[in-house]
Structures are given as C-alpha cells and as structure tokens.
Design a protein with these regions (language model features):
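Hydrophobic residues within well-ordered alpha-helices
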Residues: 17, 60-61, 102, 115
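Short helix-initiation/N-cap motifs at beta->coil->alpha
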Residues: 9-12, 47-62, 96-98
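Short beta-strand-to-loop elements that line the ligand-binding cleft
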Residues: 24, 43-52, 92
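Stable alpha-helical elements in mature extracytoplasmic
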Residues: 10-13, 30-34, 53-56, 71-75, ...
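Flexible hinge/capping segments at coil-to-helix
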Residues: 5-22
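An extracytoplasmic/periplasmic, membrane-proximal ligand-sensing/linker region
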Residues: 97, 103-173
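A ligand-binding cleft/hinge motif common to bilobed small-molecule-binding domains
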Residues: 33-40, 59-62, 66-96
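Short, small-residue-biased leader/transition segments that mark boundaries at the very start
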Residues: 1-3
Length: 173
C-alpha cells in the first residue's frame, strides 16, 4: 500500500499522519494494514471511509482527508483520472505486499493448468511486461489517460517466481 496526498503536503511517511484524517475504502485489506501500522507506529489519526475507491479519493480531493491509503495501482488510476493529477502523488513507504490471483474452483485441475501455463508463457516471453506497460505506463485510448505506474520490483519478482502461496505467506517477515 502507498499513501497518496496533495503534492505539496510534505507527507512522506505514515508517522507523519498524527492528528490527520486518513481515507481508505471500507472492506479492503488497506483498513487492516492501516490499523496495524497505526498501532505499531504509535500514530493517532482519524480513519475516514469511502464506500468505494472513487469516494475515498474524493475525500482526499475535497480536502476532507489528508491522505488516502490504498494499493498503488488504484491510487495511480484515481490520480490519472482526477481533475488536476499534478496536485497528487504517491508518497511514503509501502505498507504491505499482497498477491493478486485468479480465482477458480479448487477441483478444476484442468483450468488451473491452463491458467498457470498461460501466465508462465506470457511472463517468459516478455508479453506480460508488454501488457503491463500498455495499461499502466503508456497513454490509454480514447482519452490517452496515462496511469504512469512503472512496474515495481515486487511485481517483477512475482512474475519470475509464480506460485500458489496464500496471502498470509507474504505478510511474514
């Protein structure tokens, strides 16, 4: 997770959120991570919740929140679609690394094999990196909106080491 705030706020760390209003989206893992970091850092901030990511970003954009804590790709997409993208930035430390997966029935070994083989082939051929670049780095038609989120080292590592680990394995230090 990253925090996104007004570009001139000077917020660069969760430790600087003491006494601030921090937005996140109801029902997301960001809520859990935010509370864990709040306790661990001894920081006291007020959590404000949006019912969806657009509403959470609006809390930030309208000044009702000082930061919005969410996945980097969601933050980048909201920034790209905002009225004034240069007013916002992704700032601060990554609060967690979470895997993204394809959900399917547990007993469908044939479908799992197709999914695994396809993703492995896309990763090894470089096509997966090209698709990422197309949707997260390059302008997206028809409005040529640019999300501007370069592939992270964690994502590159995930592509190089495809696995079936549960999310809990990523939280271990």
């Amino acid at each position: 997770m990253c925090s996104s705030d007004l570009a001139n706020s000077g917020i660069t760390s969760i430790n600087q959120l003491n006494g601030k209003n921090v937005a996140t989206t109801t029902g997301t893992t960001s809520v859990q991570h935010l509370r864990r970091h709040e306790r661990a850092a001894g920081v006291d901030f007020k959590e404000v919740y949006g019912k969806d990511h657009a509403e959470s970003f609006l809390l930030l954009e309208s000044g009702r929140a000082d930061a919005f804590v969410m996945d980097g790709s969601i933050l980048a997409g909201n920034i790209a679609l905002s009225k004034n993208p240069s007013d916002f930035r992704i700032a601060g430390e990554v609060l967690s690394v979470e895997p993204i997966a394809i959900m399917m029935r547990k007993d469908d070994a044939a479908l799992k094999k197709v999914a695994d083989d396809t993703i492995k082939a896309l990763a090894s051929s470089g096509e997966l990196a090209k698709m990422y670049d197309k949707w997260f780095v390059q302008p997206i038609p028809p409005k040529n909106t640019r999300v501007g989120l370069p592939v992270s080292d964690n994502t590159k590592a995930a592509w190089a080491n495809l696995n079936d680990k549960p999310m809990e394995d990523y939280a271990k230090k």
